[in-house]
Regions:
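Intrinsically disordered, low-complexity segments enriched in polar/charged residues with Gly/Pro
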Residues: 1-4, 19, 90-93, 102-103, ...
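Short, glycine-rich, amphipathic interfacial segments at transmembrane boundaries or analogous
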Residues: 9-50, 111-132
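A short, structured surface patch at a secondary-structure boundary
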Residues: 44-107, 149-157
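Glycine-centered flexibility sites
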Residues: 7, 18-21, 40, 55, ...
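A broad detector of the eukaryotic-type serine/threonine protein kinase catalytic domain
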Residues: 34-37, 56-59, 78, 132, ...
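A hydrophobic, helix-centered structural microdomain
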Residues: 1-36, 71, 143-162
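C-terminal terminal-structure detector
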Residues: 97-162
Length: 162
């Protein structure tokens, strides 16, 4: 479907910052137009005009995230944890947002407390608000909390909401 809608490549890789600040390559299905960032890195937005028609569907049902299970298998991510950030944004966030690096005390996740409670952060101010949810998760992480997050994520996916 991706190839019919917007051509190849089908997969998208991007550097992210993981556990203890280590970089790794994140895998996703491509949902944006090719060369969407030819002008440089941009924050993703809820209504992002760089997203293809097919990409809107894939994102709505979170199908674009499925390749990240490879990152989980490789030990770079867990199912639940703070979402990983891009190094391009990471440097600024470390300077602007107190305690930002605390997010790296756990592996990044496919879903997290911030994703079910806050959604998108498209600037440093929103990222600071979202950090409070990540820190709450880190402080209260447990099998029960992980299960609650997973069930909330599955409910959100079933409803087709982000």
């Amino acid at each position: 479907i991706i190839a019919i809608d917007s051509g190849f490549p089908l997969f998208f890789t991007q550097q992210r910052t993981g556990f203890m600040g280590r970089p790794y390559t994140l895998f996703k299905l491509r949902t944006m137009k090719r060369n969407a960032e030819k002008k440089g890195a941009e924050w993703a937005k809820e209504k992002d005009n760089r997203v293809t028609r097919c990409g809107k569907f894939l994102r709505k049902w979170r199908i674009d995230e499925i390749p990240q299970f490879l990152n989980v298998i490789k030990g770079e991510m867990s199912i639940v944890g703070p979402r990983p950030e891009r190094p391009e944004f990471q440097e600024d966030l470390i300077k602007q947002v107190p305690h930002w690096n605390c997010r790296h005390l756990v592996k990044p996740g496919l879903t997290g407390w911030a994703q079910i409670r806050y959604r998108y952060a498209s600037d440093a101010d929103a990222s600071e608000e979202k950090l409070a949810y990540d820190l709450y998760y880190i402080k209260h992480a447990s099998t029960l909390v992980d299960l609650q997050i997973i069930l909330s994520t599955l409910r959100s996916i079933a409803q087709g909401s982000r």
